[in-house]
A protein has these predicted regions:
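Condensing-enzyme catalytic core mediating Claisen C-C bond formation in acyl metabolism
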Residues: 1-48, 147-203, 207, 316-390
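Conserved catalytic cysteine-centered active-site region
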Residues: 32-36, 40-50, 80-132, 249-281
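Catalytic phosphate/nucleotide-handling subdomain of diverse soluble enzymes
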Residues: 287-337
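Acidic, glycine-rich active-site loops and adjacent beta-strand->loop/helix elements
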Residues: 9-11, 77-82, 109-114, 137-142, ...
Length: 390
């Protein structure tokens, strides 16, 4: 039995900030962002957009009524949780009208959790071949106005439908994971933005990649030459580029290096315009590769490197399925062009906008333009979401 990704969808917020404008406002050389980070834009979420609305929008774009009847598990991976008790997946399950006899829960381990969700989904489908699992990585990355991490913010969700006989990618049984207890990035319950040790986190990312890659090669017998492309977790593309160079060795021909570099360049196109979406960043890179690389063909093996601060990393691979191109959206760049461009002052206003409840725990919200799902009300401290009528 083959198991893998049958469908994949993506959603981001309707607003975008150009990093050239941010650099000017922060009195920074724009090339520090465009060349130093390889970033161009970042999506900005209004108060009516959160991990639930992004997740529901990403999944709604790909699911049929038949899918909703077959799905018996909904996993939402995030580090932008909206509730310390109720899983965001439960809200999403309801908004999508998925059949009731399903498990719905949330997973957390920084940017890594969506990979763990895929592992769990695969095991579930192995046990129950007729079932389908909806895995969604949904996050809003916020570091703070004027902080070093401000240029690497973003918002978005990637939804993946996992099933037997998948039509996009089939997973291989070659996962290798590593855990190390480090404090490179963390956000305590009392903090609204994370604490980041940037240089240390970069070191941990690259060392986790190198050591996990060495172990992966040892266990599988595979080498870099066996892969058509490598996708990386993308907190910002320049770090992933350093990662690619880290695993290139003298045994790789110049022709192969050129191929891997070209495919890497296709994998970062969406992230350059959306920014960091934490749990979804790796899979946004995968989606960008699949939708923008005309050289890929059925049977090609793709390696994926997942990293979550704290830290857990994992390397695994998947093979492209014949006809995968038909399940993709090749007009995604045009959709990104349709976002509303914000001035820096408008971005700052949205950044600082917070829930302002009355004494009874109530507030009504007006959905932003072009939202598919929106937070419309908080009533007695209970969040209400609705599909927005077009």
């Amino acid at each position: 039995m083959t198991i893998g990704i049958d469908k994949i969808g993506f959603a981001t917020s309707p607003y975008v900030l150009r990093l050239e404008d941010l650099a000017t406002a922060r009195d920074t050389d724009p090339e520090k962002l465009s060349k130093g980070l390889l970033l161009k834009e970042q999506s900005v979420a209004p108060i009516t957009e959160d991990i639930v609305t992004l997740a529901a929008t990403a999944a709604d774009d790909i699911l049929t009524d038949e899918d909703k009847e077959a799905i018996d598990m909904v996993i939402l991976a995030t580090e932008s949780g909206i509730d310390q008790s109720k899983a965001a997946a439960v809200f999403v399950h309801g908004l999508l009208d998925i059949q009731p006899f399903a498990r719905s829960f949330e997973m957390k381990e920084a940017c890594y959790a969506a990979t763990a969700a895929l592992d769990y989904a695969k095991l579930h489908v192995e046990k129950f071949p007729q079932s389908k699992v909806l895995v969604i990585a949904s996050d809003i990355a916020k570091y703070g106005i004027g902080t070093p991490g401000e240029p690497t913010q973003g918002a978005g969700a990637v939804a993946m439908l996992i099933s037997q006989n998948p039509r996009i990618l089939s997973f291989n049984d070659d996962n290798v994971a590593q855990t190390r207890d480090v404090m490179d990035f963390w956000r305590p319950n009392y903090a609204t933005t994370p604490f980041v040790n940037g240089i240390y986190s970069t070191q941990q990312y690259l060392d986790s990649l190198k050591t996990t890659w060495v172990e992966y090669q040892k266990r599988t017998g595979l080498a870099l030459t066996d892969f058509a492309a490598v996708c990386f977790h993308l907190p910002y593309p320049k770090l992933a580029l350093k990662g690619l160079k880290k695993i290139l060795d003298k045994s790789v021909s110049e022709e192969k290096k050129d191929q891997l570099q070209y495919n890497f360049d296709q994998s970062i196109l969406y992230s350059q315009r959306v920014g960091n979406i934490y749990t979804g960043s790796l899979f946004l890179g995968l989606l960008s590769l699949l939708e923008n690389d005309p050289q890929l063909k059925a049977g090609d093996r793709i390696a994926l490197f997942s990293y979550g601060s704290g830290a857990v990393s994992e390397i695994f691979s998947a093979n492209l399925v014949p006809g995968f191109e038909q399940l993709l959206d090749h007009k995604r760049m045009e959709k990104l062009d349709q976002r509303t461009v914000l001035s820096v002052s408008d971005y700052e206003r949205l950044f600082y906008e917070e829930v302002d409840l009355d004494p009874s725990g109530n507030q009504v919200f007006e959905p932003a333009t072009h939202q598919t799902f929106a937070l419309t009300e908080i009533k007695e401290h209970q969040r209400t979401y609705q599909k927005v009528e077009k």
